[in-house]
């Protein structure tokens, strides 16, 4: 049996029936990590995870399970999520050497249930990027074809699951940073409703949109981990309860489900391979009895402008804390305070991060804040969110491709931010309206690259979305892509 090709639920079954040791499972993932270092998915694989595995094996041997429903389940973690006594760098030179003094709430909940955190994964610096190339540790490559990008910003978390270096991983999703790399690497990528998972311990990028998300090969695994990590948290005032009676996930026919298709996301705008795959996806759903209705939401035409107005403003505010005075790397030169700030941030932040900070500060400057930032917030709250709320009164889910484009070649669009930002046009919708969304692997092109399809659900109806996605995978025969 290949121990590195297991779902979490299968690991649970093998461990509880004592057919396999947790240590042997973790060792299999460690060996896969050693064989696939060129992908650059991990920043660090935790060697002490093997010691924890031995300890849990002893607990199982002595029948000392306590309340550990996730015992022995290996999970990789994006490097912007805090794990006590582990490095937290957000893949930035400016934070190298920083050790987190506390656990994020999601991490604490996983540890308390018996999960084993096996490593920190690579990412675009401070979660800013859509290719996985903007990291001080180097680019993460696509396991399906190493000449192409994995997508970002949670590229490392996607890569380690896609290459079976981990069965499950945590990422963060601000505008599609979980779903895009999931689509590019042929796995599942899930973003919960805004507030569904506590953001305490997640390094902030754009606080209005940030959300921890999951990568997996299994819908059941996503639902299991969501069940044990979701819920309100006193450390995060935006957190909400989302658990409902759709868990365990329901097996239902697709017959009669009402799906919406947004007219403005025209197939004419898509890469031809994406367009043909999306057309087939729609046909497959219709053949199973689902109803698909085309709706017009004109505000989609400037949804990227809204996102790339609000998110840089929040980023410029959130990243102001990285001064070099309290934590992270520090210049030792004798400089004035202003010169210290200037040199420190100029030397230790990447071009993409500086680009977004400068844009955010510009949009907040006198005379422009009301013209751009305030206007964007007004349009979002008064037009976009109400329109989607109205749409969900008559439909169950929205379907789109995960991205209009296929993966870029490594380095090809490094200096073309507009093209890179355009890859987010479908995914930012869920972040702006606070809804749950998932990317399903649907097809592959002649280069072996994956094309994913996105399903967006109602806010706080995450398990309903996961149940529907499970049934789409089952009825369309998408397992094993």
Swiss-Prot record:
<dbReference type="InterPro" id="IPR004412">
    <property type="entry name" value="GatA"/>
</dbReference>
<protein>
    <recommendedName>
        <fullName>Glutamyl-tRNA(Gln) amidotransferase subunit A</fullName>
        <ecNumber>6.3.5.7</ecNumber>
    </recommendedName>
</protein>
<dbReference type="InterPro" id="IPR023631">
    <property type="entry name" value="Amidase_dom"/>
</dbReference>
<comment type="function">
    <text>Allows the formation of correctly charged Gln-tRNA(Gln) through the transamidation of misacylated Glu-tRNA(Gln) in organisms which lack glutaminyl-tRNA synthetase. The reaction takes place in the presence of glutamine and ATP through an activated gamma-phospho-Glu-tRNA(Gln).</text>
</comment>
<comment type="similarity">
    <text>Belongs to the amidase family. GatA subfamily.</text>
</comment>
<feature type="active site" description="Charge relay system">
    <location>
        <position position="153"/>
    </location>
</feature>
<feature type="active site" description="Charge relay system">
    <location>
        <position position="78"/>
    </location>
</feature>
<feature type="active site" description="Acyl-ester intermediate">
    <location>
        <position position="177"/>
    </location>
</feature>
<keyword id="KW-0547">Nucleotide-binding</keyword>
<dbReference type="GO" id="GO:0030956">
    <property type="term" value="C:glutamyl-tRNA(Gln) amidotransferase complex"/>
</dbReference>
<dbReference type="GO" id="GO:0006412">
    <property type="term" value="P:translation"/>
</dbReference>
<keyword id="KW-0436">Ligase</keyword>
<dbReference type="GO" id="GO:0005524">
    <property type="term" value="F:ATP binding"/>
</dbReference>
<comment type="subunit">
    <text>Heterotrimer of A, B and C subunits.</text>
</comment>
<dbReference type="InterPro" id="IPR000120">
    <property type="entry name" value="Amidase"/>
</dbReference>
<dbReference type="Pfam" id="PF01425">
    <property type="entry name" value="Amidase"/>
</dbReference>
<keyword id="KW-0067">ATP-binding</keyword>
<dbReference type="InterPro" id="IPR020556">
    <property type="entry name" value="Amidase_CS"/>
</dbReference>
<dbReference type="InterPro" id="IPR036928">
    <property type="entry name" value="AS_sf"/>
</dbReference>
<dbReference type="GO" id="GO:0050567">
    <property type="term" value="F:glutaminyl-tRNA synthase (glutamine-hydrolyzing) activity"/>
</dbReference>
<keyword id="KW-0648">Protein biosynthesis</keyword>
């Amino acid at each position: 049996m290949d121990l590195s090709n297991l779902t979490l639920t299968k690991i649970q079954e093998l461990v509880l029936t004592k057919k396999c040791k947790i240590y042997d499972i973790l060792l299999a993932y460690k060996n896969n990590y050693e064989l696939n270092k060129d992908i650059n998915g991990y920043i660090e694989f935790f060697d002490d995870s093997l010691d924890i595995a031995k300890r849990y094996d002893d607990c199982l041997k002595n029948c000392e399970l306590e309340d550990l429903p996730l015992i022995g389940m290996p999970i990789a973690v994006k490097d912007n999520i805090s794990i006590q006594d582990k490095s937290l760098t957000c893949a930035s030179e400016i934070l190298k050497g920083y050790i987190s003094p506390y656990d994020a709430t999601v991490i604490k909940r996983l540890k308390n249930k018996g999960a084993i955190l096996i490593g920190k994964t690579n990412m675009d610096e401070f979660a800013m990027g859509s290719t996985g190339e903007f990291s001080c540790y180097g680019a993460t490559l696509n396991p399906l074809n190493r000449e192409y990008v994995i997508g970002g910003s949670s590229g490392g978390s996607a890569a380690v699951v896609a290459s079976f270096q981990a069965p499950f991983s945590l990422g963060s999703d601000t505008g599609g940073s979980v779903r895009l790399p999931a689509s590019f690497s042929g796995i599942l990528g899930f973003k919960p409703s805004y507030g569904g998972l506590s953001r305490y311990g997640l390094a902030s990028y754009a606080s209005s949109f940030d959300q921890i998300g999951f990568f997996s090969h299994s819908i059941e695994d996503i639902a299991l981990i969501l069940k044990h990590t979701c819920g309100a948290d006193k450390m995060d005032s935006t957190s909400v309860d989302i658990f409902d009676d759709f868990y365990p996930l329901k097996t239902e026919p697709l017959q009669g489900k009402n799906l919406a298709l947004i007219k403005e996301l025209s197939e004419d705008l898509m890469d031809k391979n994406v367009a043909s795959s999306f057309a087939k996806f729609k046909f497959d759903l219709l053949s199973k009895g689902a109803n698909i209705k085309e709706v017009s939401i004109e505000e989609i035409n400037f949804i990227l402008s809204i996102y790339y107005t609000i998110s840089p403003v929040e980023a410029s505010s959130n990243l102001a804390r990285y001064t070099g005075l309290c934590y992270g790397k520090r210049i030792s030169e004798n400089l004035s305070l202003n010169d210290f700030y200037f040199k420190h941030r100029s030397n230790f932040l990447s071009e993409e991060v500086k680009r977004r900070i400068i844009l955010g500060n510009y949009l907040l400057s006198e005379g422009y804040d009301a013209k751009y930032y305030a206007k964007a917030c007004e349009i979002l709250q008064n037009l976009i969110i109400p329109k989607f709320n109205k749409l969900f009164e008559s439909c169950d889910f929205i379907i789109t491709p995960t991205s209009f484009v296929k993966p870029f070649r490594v380095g090809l669009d490094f200096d073309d931010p507009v093209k890179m930002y355009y890859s987010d046009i479908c995914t930012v919708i869920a972040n702006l309206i606070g809804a749950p969304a998932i990317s399903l692997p649907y097809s592959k092109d002649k280069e072996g690259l994956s094309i994913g399809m996105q399903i967006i659900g109602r806010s706080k109806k995450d398990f309903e979305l996961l149940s529907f996605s499970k049934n789409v995978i089952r009825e369309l025969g998408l397992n094993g892509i």
